[in-house]
Design a protein with these regions (language model features):
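Low-complexity intrinsically disordered segments
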Residues: 2-20, 24, 186
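Short, charged/polar, low-complexity loop and linker segments
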Residues: 102-114, 139
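Heme-based O2/NO sensor domains and their adjacent alpha-helical segments
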Residues: 63-107
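N-terminal interaction modules that seed assembly of large macromolecular complexes
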Residues: 14-79
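Amphipathic, non-membrane alpha-helical segments in soluble helical-bundle scaffolds
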Residues: 16-19, 23, 43-46, 82-85, ...
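Short secondary-structure capping micro-motifs at structural edges
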Residues: 73-77, 113-118
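Alpha-helical repeat scaffolds in large eukaryotic proteins
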Residues: 27-38, 54-65, 90-93, 97, ...
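Acidic, proline/glycine-rich low-complexity IDRs
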Residues: 1-7, 114-117, 125-186
Length: 186
């Protein structure tokens, strides 16, 4: 099911411009997070991760606000093996150290108890979903790519991104706002 514009997600609609924007955002996120996992962010790793996640969440929000992408068939072509993101995951875990694990209500409407999550897992999960869509996009199947990115944003990586965004924001906020208690004042 090749998509050079002839296979629109809905009759009469051209999804290629949005697919191009999402593909560029996905590449930027993957490249940025990979650089940070390699240690290129130094002491600014957490604020830079906050920026990366905020930017990809904006892209996801555009997908969530768009009409549903409907494929003409009810199947998704195979894109090959899932990427091995262990180097990314372990690199992020090493950079985040004690700030990697956090507690979250994954679904604030359904979950009554907080669950432990890891930022490194969340970011690798987001990257995996974005890469899956990029594999469709780079194979010339922009409709399938867009369908995948939209579906997986609503169902999977958007949830991980939202949780990671809150956790990263909390780390940045604590670093900037927490004041050590002055023993002379207490």
């Amino acid at each position: 099911m090749s998509d050079d514009g002839d296979s629109a997600a809905r009759p009469g609609e051209d999804w290629r411009p949005l697919a191009h924007q999402v593909a560029q955002s996905a590449r930027d996120f993957i490249d940025g997070v990979a650089a940070l996992a390699r240690g290129e962010g130094g002491e600014e790793t957490v604020p830079l991760l906050l920026l990366e996640v905020a930017q990809i969440q904006l892209t996801g929000a555009k997908l969530g606000a768009s009409k549903d992408v409907i494929l003409p068939g009810n199947w998704e072509p195979d894109v090959g093996a899932d990427p091995d993101l262990d180097v990314l995951r372990t690199g992020l875990a090493a950079r985040l150290e004690h700030g990697d694990e956090y507690a979250e209500l994954f679904d604030p409407y359904a979950d009554a108890k907080a669950t432990a999550f890891r930022l490194s897992d969340d970011l690798a999960t987001i990257a995996a979903d974005l890469i899956h869509g990029l594999q469709h996009y780079e194979a010339g199947r922009s409709s399938e790519a867009l369908w995948w990115w939209q579906y997986s944003y609503v169902n999977h990586w958007g949830l991980h991104g939202g949780a990671a965004l809150r956790a990263l924001h909390a780390v940045v906020a604590h670093a900037r706002l927490d004041v050590a208690e002055d023993p002379a004042v207490s």
